[in-house]
């Protein structure tokens, strides 16, 4: 898969992105968290410790609050 494929998947799946401390929370359309999480892992895996996807929510753990802020900015740019 190409980066464009993952970007498109993310944009079609995600409703919102926010962060608190060293966590990023991504709200997705129902059933789309797992595919969106794969996209985030592929595109931004080097910016995080790990990720966990439920049905409509993704939790990402980063190294610190600054990394969470940077990742949130990158993810919101994809949605813009």
Name every feature range the model reports, one short phrase each.
Residues 76-80:
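Ferredoxin-like alpha/beta domains used as RNA- or RNAP-binding modules
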Residues 2-72:
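Non-DNA-binding regulatory cores of transcription-related proteins
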């Amino acid at each position: 898969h190409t980066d464009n494929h993952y970007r498109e998947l993310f944009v079609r799946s995600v409703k919102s992105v926010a962060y608190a401390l060293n966590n990023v929370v991504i709200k997705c359309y129902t059933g789309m968290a797992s595919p969106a999480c794969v996209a985030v892992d592929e595109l931004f895996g080097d910016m995080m410790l790990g990720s966990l996807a439920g049905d409509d929510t993704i939790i990402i753990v980063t190294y610190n609050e600054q990394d969470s802020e940077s990742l949130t900015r990158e993810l919101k740019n994809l949605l813009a």
